A protein has these predicted regions:
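Catalytic-core regions of core metabolic enzymes
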Residues: 1-185
């Protein structure tokens, strides 16, 4: 939430147990918000993510980032849950990043939808990685070495939107030069 507050974008917090978060009104459910939602960032225990994704579908959210872990990276049971979430997002035609990711940063749009410790300097390099830990480390180093980025994507488990789609987007949109990516083995 702290990263979003810096972006000066309109944000809504959703938490069924708190009426305020960082001094802002918190809604019990995304359905209670009387506005269109461009992006939902889900950071809750894995066992309730599917219900929240279904709420996002009913709300006609345009995109979803799931930072929560506890899915395919944990074994067969987690993979089954991840597949159910993917099916829901696919059927609703809602792009889904994650789960198990750090999030995204678009410095050209002034958006930090991640759990990175701080927003890096704006530059020309796009950074993509499955590993949120690697991105976190590179953001730390970039601050020390005065390096900048245009966009940063941690795509996690790639249950729906994957590395090849991000590479194609960056290539077609000519949004960055060069593109750096770490591929898992």
């Amino acid at each position: 939430v702290k990263n979003f507050l810096q972006s000066k974008k309109k944000i809504y917090c959703v938490n069924p147990f708190k009426s305020k978060i960082f001094g802002m009104q918190s809604f019990k459910n995304i359905r209670d918000i009387n506005d269109k939602i461009d992006l939902a960032i889900i950071a809750v225990p894995a066992k309730i993510v599917l219900d929240i994704v279904l709420d996002c579908v009913n709300k006609k959210v345009k995109g979803i980032i799931i930072v929560s872990s506890g899915f395919g990276e944990t074994g067969e049971k987690g993979k089954e849950l991840e597949n159910k979430i993917k099916e829901v997002a696919d059927k609703a035609k809602i792009p889904l990043i994650g789960p198990n990711c750090l999030g995204i940063i678009n410095l050209n749009q002034g958006l930090n939808a991640s759990f990175a410790p701080f927003t890096p300097k704006k530059g020309n390099v796009a950074l993509l990685s499955q590993s949120g830990a690697l991105i976190d480390a590179l953001i730390d180093i970039s601050g020390e070495d005065n390096l900048g980025f245009s966009k940063i994507v941690s795509y996690g488990n790639e249950s729906q939107v994957d590395l090849t789609q991000f590479l194609q987007y960056f290539k077609n949109a000519a949004v960055a030069q060069p593109i750096s990516s770490m591929l898992p083995f």
